[in-house]
Every structure is written in C-alpha cells, then in structure tokens.
Amino acid sequence: MTTTMEYHNPVLLHPTVDGLDIKPDGIYVDVTFGGGGHSKEILRRLGPNGKLFAFDQDEDALANALPDERFTLINENFRFIKRFLRFHGIKAVDGILADLGVSSHQFDVPERGFSTRFDAELDMRMSQKNDLNAYRVVNEYEEQDLRRVFFDYGELKNAPVLARTIVEARHHRPIKTTDELKEVLKKYLPEKVRNKILAQIYQAIRIEVNQEMDVLKEFIEQSLEILKPGGRFSVISYHSLEDRLVKRFIKNGMFEGEPERDFYGNFSVPFKTIGKLIVPDDEEIKINNRARSAKLRIAEKI
C-alpha cells in the first residue's frame, strides 16, 4: 500500500501550518489534500471541537482519507470551495491552506502523463472526470490557441514556432504520447536546456487542461468571502504565474489594476501580509526536490 510520504512529501510543512495560527476549536480547510501531510499536522494542533475540511479532485487521494471524526474529505475541485462548504453547513472558516500545482504522486505515476521522465498517453488531467485532456489540446486546438497556451502558460518566446510545428506534424498523424510530442519538437530542444524547455511545454499544456489559472482566481476570490475577519490564508505556489496572482490579490484585493479607496481616499485592501515570503532551506530541498521552487505567502483577512 502506498504510504503518505511515498504519495506526497509535504512542502514547508511547519511554516505553512504555523501560518494558519490554529485555534483549537477553529474550522480550517486544506484545499489540496493529496497524501494528507498538511492535514495531519492541522489535526494534530486542533482540539476535540475543531474541524478540518479537505478538498482534492484527484480520485487517487481518497485512499489517504484520515479516520478522524473532525475530518471531512471532499472529492471536488477547490474552485467549488464555497458551494461544498455550505453543503456541509459551513459559511465561514478560520483558515485556508493551499499547496498548489501537481503532487509528487501525480508526477510519479507514468500513465498520468505529467512527467517528462516517462512515455505515456497525453493526459495530464488532475481529475479523470474532466473531458479535456492533453491529447485534445495537442491535436484539436487551432494554431493560434496553441500559441496562446505556450506563450501565456509556458512563457515560451518561441511559442509561434512550437504551435506551427505541432499543427504540421498532426496533419500527417495524431500525436498520441509524450514521447511522440518530444519527437515532433526535438529540434527546438537543444541538449543544454532540453529539460527546462520540456518542463515549460508540459506546464503550459497541463495548466490549459486543468484550467489552473481560472481555478486559482475563483478559489482566491471565494476564500476572501468565507474567511472570518482575522482568518489566515496560507498558500504555497510553484511557478511565477501562480505566485503573481496570489501576491497581487493579497496586496490589492484584485488581480489587475489599483485597489479600491475608502471614503477618505485610503486604499482599501482585504488582507494584511503576515511575515515575509518563505522559501525552503537547502536541507529541505535536499530531502524533497519538489520543494526547490516553492514560495509560501501568508495573509490575514482584515
């Protein structure tokens, strides 16, 4: 049986949970349950009357459900956090934790198609219930849409040529696997930067398949609605696109533009930042390579 640590090494475990400033009788939400590492630590700090709700859209995570009467696991995308908490009678919470991106488990299961290390069918769905997968993005998207995906989500300067090359190749036969995709794009993968560019290409397709940026925006906006005044928001991001959204919303209460002003002309913002940006130390990165790009931001609702 797969253990929690094999499934997912919790990144920045103690700083992330410390950031929630756990109240023993509080109500908390872990929106990225995975192997349950962060949830276990939250439960350890909760008293007998505290509650923890966890979300994970990946069906594989259900095997890690914790046998604790204070704990409820919801097999849904966290973009629906408000809806499903209300279903359970919860309208306001004391803290929300999010460990964004792909779990170690998802990267390590070849058939999921997330990792550049394995050949697999083009899938990349975080939930097998979703209709859109990587095969459809690669084989059905118009050239201009592929260009947008690679430019916006992979931050690839050669997005136009990558999109054109894929469209020309699939005209002859469908691109069905990750190795076939690598073969199609091999002349744009020089050895020195091959892994970096591949990671950017995979990231771009994965974000599109799972609508990650739209999901993140919806989640952050709903989190503001359901957090109590003084409630904590503790978020780990792994790439600049995620971190930029989190940082802007914490700072301004919006993703673009200037924050609103109050009657006296002062900026009206919903959060105050708690502490500085936290990143893993060398020791954690040595133990858990996934932590190398992690950035933790903590905020408190005003």
From Swiss-Prot:
UniProt entry tagged with the keyword Cytoplasm: yes
Spans traversing the lipid bilayer: none
Record localization: Cytoplasm
EC number(s) reported in the record: 2.1.1.199
The protein, known as: Ribosomal RNA small subunit methyltransferase H
Organism this protein belongs to: Flavobacterium johnsoniae (strain ATCC 17061 / DSM 2064 / JCM 8514 / BCRC 14874 / CCUG 350202 / NBRC 14942 / NCIMB 11054 / UW101) (Cytophaga johnsonae)
GO molecular function terms attached to this record: rRNA (cytosine-N4-)-methyltransferase activity
GO cellular component, one term: cytoplasm
Pfam short name (any one): Methyltransf_5
Catalysis: reaction(s): cytidine(1402) in 16S rRNA + S-adenosyl-L-methionine = N(4)-methylcytidine(1402) in 16S rRNA + S-adenosyl-L-homocysteine + H(+)
Keywords tagged on the record: Cytoplasm, Methyltransferase, rRNA processing, S-adenosyl-L-methionine, Transferase
Gene Ontology biological-process annotations: rRNA base methylation
Superkingdom field: Bacteria
Residues noted as binding S-adenosyl-L-methionine in the record, renumbered to the chain: 36-38, 56, 84, 99, 106
PANTHER family, alphabetized: 12S RRNA N4-METHYLCYTIDINE METHYLTRANSFERASE, S-ADENOSYL-METHYLTRANSFERASE MRAW
Keyword Cytoplasm: yes
Family classification: Belongs to the methyltransferase superfamily. RsmH family.
Protein's job: Specifically methylates the N4 position of cytidine in position 1402 (C1402) of 16S rRNA.
